[in-house]
Amino acid sequence: MIILGIDPGFEKLGCAVLKKEKTGDKLIYSTCLISKKKDPHEQRLLYLGKEIRKIIKKYKPDILSVEKLFF
């Protein structure tokens, strides 16, 4: 089973892809996506969306987990 975990953020968004195996969980990919502060909000969201789509296309996760935002 492949799991995509997302730590949401507008400026910095964390992503990790884990593979659940009988012997335990294995980290197969992680990154921090950083949008440019000078770009308009819609352009920043578009960038983050495109990058997440690339990750989904490459790793084909079975499950998505999104961390709850705390303010």
Predicted feature locations:
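Phosphate- and other anionic-substrate recognition elements at nucleic-acid/protein interfaces
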Residues: M1-F71
